[in-house]
């Protein structure tokens, strides 16, 4: 009996120690597209989050506690995003890095706000997200209201086209950016011949290409993602159309070159700066390459910065309450791989720079002149 009692007591102690160890893990939901047409953007996000968590834990974690990433796939689909958000609530996770697409982030954010969960999005750029008075929603990405004017300024001052078409994919991200560019161009009395939408996932753009030729369009701005832009470029060049194309960071992806081939050469794209070329980030670049991950994608770094920001607030406050972390970040900012970040009361960054780049057929890019 005594031996059995000792065994039971030892088992109870081991179980208690096990539960204590489990309690020391700080779970962080990482949500993005593992599937769907823009899963490659999700790859950037997950790679950035994984590397950030790995690096933070290697330095001792949060006061000795480890960050644990729990990954979810929303496919950049609004309905799936809502299901994922509810799953995160049921899983008892207090912090979310994600979502990536504006169209999936906004409905998910309603749930996080209601449940008091902190969400830091590294990719949702639509301004509406943070204009609803929510207290638990932040982002490390710049806004369409900044990226759009950057594109418009370059179009007006450098390209100086005569006849412009603006096209979008009818989604929150793409249409929002297209309207922002249109506003900038119209304010300067530029000749925007037409503004029209296509359907995301569409592959046959023969009617659109014919319209561009008929209207003598010499410049196209497309608000959307790389699958459609790649098809547009390939089909336009196949019929001899030499119109200049431009898009946002959603088109700046190596997969675009796989779709468009040589037709990708010379496309213009607005993107964040190349954080992988910052000497201060060389150690992270080397670690990513050693793990056979591409360090060049912007969302690798913007997501890494989102995780860093969360970790900074957890370490600095010693609190696990989401609202306390939000208040700390808004008051004190965070130093990250993309530079020092400071947020306004809405949860938007006070400054985020976009540049204009020229895309090349091999999937690389260089600063546009």
UniProtKB/Swiss-Prot annotation:
GO annotation, biological process: branched-chain amino acid transport; isoleucine transport; L-leucine transport; phenylalanine transport; valine transport
**Where does it reside?**
Periplasm
Q: According to its UniProt record, where is this protein mainly located?
A: periplasm
* An example Gene Ontology molecular-function term: L-leucine binding
Spans through the membrane: none
Query: What does UniProt give as GO cellular component?
Result: ATP-binding cassette (ABC) transporter complex, substrate-binding subunit-containing; membrane; outer membrane-bounded periplasmic space
Does the keyword field hold Disulfide bond? Answer: yes
> What is the residue range of the signal peptide feature?
1-23
Q: Could you tell me which CDD domains the record lists for this protein? A: PBP1_ABC_LIVBP-like
Q: Which UniProt keywords apply?
A: Amino-acid transport, Disulfide bond, Periplasm, Signal, Transport
Q: Pfam families, alphabetically?
A: Peripla_BP_6 (PF13458)
Which cysteines are disulphide-bonded?
76-101
NCBIfam families per record:
PRK15404.1 (NF011933)
Q: What does this protein do?
A: This protein is a component of the leucine-specific transport system, which is one of the two periplasmic binding protein-dependent transport systems of the high-affinity transport of the branched-chain amino acids in E.coli.
- Family that this chain belongs to: Belongs to the leucine-binding protein family.
What protein am I looking at?
Leucine-specific-binding protein
Q: Which organism is it from?
A: Escherichia coli (strain K12)
